[in-house]
Amino acid sequence: MSNPRHNEREVRSPRGDELNAKSWLTEAPLRMLMNNLDPDVAERPHELVVYGGIGRAARTWDDFDRIVATLKTLNDDETLLVQSGKPVGVFRTHKDAPRVLIANSNLVPHWANWDHFNELDKKGLAMYGQMTAGSWIYIGAQGIVQGTYETFVEAGRQHYGGNLKGRWILTGGLGGMGGAQPLAAVMAGACCLAVECDETRADFRLRTRYVDEKTHSLDEALAKIDAWTKAGEAKSIALIGNAAEIFPELVKRGVKPDIVTDQTSAHDPVHGYLPLGWTVAEWRAKQENDPKVVEKAARASMKVQVQAMLDFWNAGIPTVDYGNNIRQMALEEGLENAFAFPGFVPAYIRPLFCRGIGPFRWAALSGDPEDIAKTDAKVKELLPDNKHLHNWLDMAKERIAFQGLPARICWVGLGDRHRLGLAFNEMVRNGELKAPIVIGRDHLDSGSVASPNRETEAMKDGSDAVSDWPLLNALLNTASGATWVSLHHGGGVGMGFSQHAGMVICCDGTEDADRRLERVLWNDPATGVMRHADAGYDIALDWARKQGLRLPAILGN
């Protein structure tokens, strides 16, 4: 019996200004779905896996084909419903309604665990959508680069006087998310040693210039790091190995990095983390044949790695969980103080979230990099005083290789997102851009996620696990007229640990799009300010007042 999730075909998004669907509002999700499976974008495109363990774009290849066929014929008053990667219905709505509504991986809380999900997955009844895999707005490793860069820069401010020159970062994982780390470190002025067990992933990052060098030798990696830091150079190296082996070995040797973190796919103990002593081939085979054995061995190995991270933390080295739930896995394995070191959001990112600042992104449906160059220039023009953002855009232009359709990530917040969206739409309307632009974001944003071990860890009022907020975010984006809206469970940290929502909106140059863009790109980040104001953060309360938000139970207006 053939595997419905495996196909050797190569998928690439159409380019140019010729429509394959009835309008740009259906052409946009069509192209972005296909872009998610571009071999230059996805981790394992032949298996529909985009990133993050088993984060898929569609449930099966038949479902992919059905989604594509449906989008090509969808009318401007119809909405396609996608249930865990399967196109289950088309319904009459109206022209300002989303063209696609997506729900991925959602389970009733009592059953929201990997065992139950994997059982459903095996039967073909579910699909893990991660965050931007199943919501069709993954743009390659760039999608996390700026967030990682902002994190490292803030760590430098807090611990090293704002200067990471001559410093180095130890981390693990070079997958779809972790692959951003070495480049982000270098852009922040630091060196990076990234441990990766799968050499094909390291090679992918070398090819796309996200990492500078590769080695199989720990001694060589350390020698390179030592030489670079002494010379004040910012460079990165991938070490082929197992983080659960390398991290403790560095502790044993007394090696002291300047910052320690990890972005292995520890959120998925079957598909995301290589057990100690295993080969990658053995691991892949046993994922199918004996997943329970894999999970047990992986969890035990995670405990070993987290203990090493605790050893670094106890030695006074800034150490953070980068949102893969590895501390939780170690805690469940009996490591009682696994949460002694913080997650990256409460440590470095939350003040940005309080102002609705997060991973705003856009992609050029034309496929022409010049369209991104023009939008970069427009961002600088509209935000002339944000020198930090200008610096980011300059570095991104120089260092970031596009994967699939040209795209840009740019952290901006409430008050700026809608201005950029309207400006991009005007550029489409007057012909400055060769085709429409889509604007989206990661589900990791200020108002769109409940994740007590990551984005909502250690909330001021203790509301870490309250997931009303992402549900309200999805509902409001739907009511506001986003082109497609998604509601997922388990992204980033795994089953049972998160709920989150996404939106994408198309700038097709029309006046109708102006109205939708103004609503969506104001309301979406405003929910983040609202959520943090409700939790009692002064920055959010002040920003809500400044932006004129009407929050009756919070501001009394």
Swiss-Prot record:
<comment type="similarity">
    <text>Belongs to the urocanase family.</text>
</comment>
<dbReference type="GO" id="GO:0005737">
    <property type="term" value="C:cytoplasm"/>
</dbReference>
<dbReference type="Pfam" id="PF17391">
    <property type="entry name" value="Urocanase_N"/>
</dbReference>
<feature type="binding site">
    <location>
        <position position="130"/>
    </location>
    <ligand>
        <name>NAD(+)</name>
    </ligand>
</feature>
<dbReference type="GO" id="GO:0019557">
    <property type="term" value="P:L-histidine catabolic process to glutamate and formate"/>
</dbReference>
<feature type="region of interest" description="Disordered">
    <location>
        <begin position="1"/>
        <end position="20"/>
    </location>
</feature>
<dbReference type="Pfam" id="PF17392">
    <property type="entry name" value="Urocanase_C"/>
</dbReference>
<keyword id="KW-0520">NAD</keyword>
<keyword id="KW-0963">Cytoplasm</keyword>
<keyword id="KW-0456">Lyase</keyword>
<dbReference type="InterPro" id="IPR036190">
    <property type="entry name" value="Urocanase_sf"/>
</dbReference>
<feature type="binding site">
    <location>
        <position position="201"/>
    </location>
    <ligand>
        <name>NAD(+)</name>
    </ligand>
</feature>
<dbReference type="GO" id="GO:0019556">
    <property type="term" value="P:L-histidine catabolic process to glutamate and formamide"/>
</dbReference>
<dbReference type="InterPro" id="IPR035401">
    <property type="entry name" value="Urocanase_C"/>
</dbReference>
<feature type="binding site">
    <location>
        <begin position="242"/>
        <end position="243"/>
    </location>
    <ligand>
        <name>NAD(+)</name>
    </ligand>
</feature>
<feature type="binding site">
    <location>
        <begin position="52"/>
        <end position="53"/>
    </location>
    <ligand>
        <name>NAD(+)</name>
    </ligand>
</feature>
<dbReference type="InterPro" id="IPR055351">
    <property type="entry name" value="Urocanase"/>
</dbReference>
<keyword id="KW-0369">Histidine metabolism</keyword>
<dbReference type="InterPro" id="IPR023637">
    <property type="entry name" value="Urocanase-like"/>
</dbReference>
<feature type="binding site">
    <location>
        <position position="196"/>
    </location>
    <ligand>
        <name>NAD(+)</name>
    </ligand>
</feature>
<dbReference type="InterPro" id="IPR035400">
    <property type="entry name" value="Urocanase_N"/>
</dbReference>
<dbReference type="InterPro" id="IPR023636">
    <property type="entry name" value="Urocanase_CS"/>
</dbReference>
<protein>
    <recommendedName>
        <fullName>Urocanate hydratase</fullName>
        <ecNumber>4.2.1.49</ecNumber>
    </recommendedName>
</protein>
<feature type="binding site">
    <location>
        <begin position="263"/>
        <end position="267"/>
    </location>
    <ligand>
        <name>NAD(+)</name>
    </ligand>
</feature>
<feature type="binding site">
    <location>
        <position position="492"/>
    </location>
    <ligand>
        <name>NAD(+)</name>
    </ligand>
</feature>
<feature type="binding site">
    <location>
        <begin position="176"/>
        <end position="178"/>
    </location>
    <ligand>
        <name>NAD(+)</name>
    </ligand>
</feature>
<dbReference type="InterPro" id="IPR035085">
    <property type="entry name" value="Urocanase_Rossmann-like"/>
</dbReference>
<comment type="function">
    <text>Catalyzes the conversion of urocanate to 4-imidazolone-5-propionate.</text>
</comment>
<feature type="active site">
    <location>
        <position position="410"/>
    </location>
</feature>
<dbReference type="InterPro" id="IPR038364">
    <property type="entry name" value="Urocanase_central_sf"/>
</dbReference>
<dbReference type="GO" id="GO:0016153">
    <property type="term" value="F:urocanate hydratase activity"/>
</dbReference>
<feature type="binding site">
    <location>
        <begin position="273"/>
        <end position="274"/>
    </location>
    <ligand>
        <name>NAD(+)</name>
    </ligand>
</feature>
<comment type="pathway">
    <text>Amino-acid degradation; L-histidine degradation into L-glutamate; N-formimidoyl-L-glutamate from L-histidine: step 2/3.</text>
</comment>
<dbReference type="Pfam" id="PF01175">
    <property type="entry name" value="Urocanase"/>
</dbReference>
<feature type="binding site">
    <location>
        <position position="322"/>
    </location>
    <ligand>
        <name>NAD(+)</name>
    </ligand>
</feature>
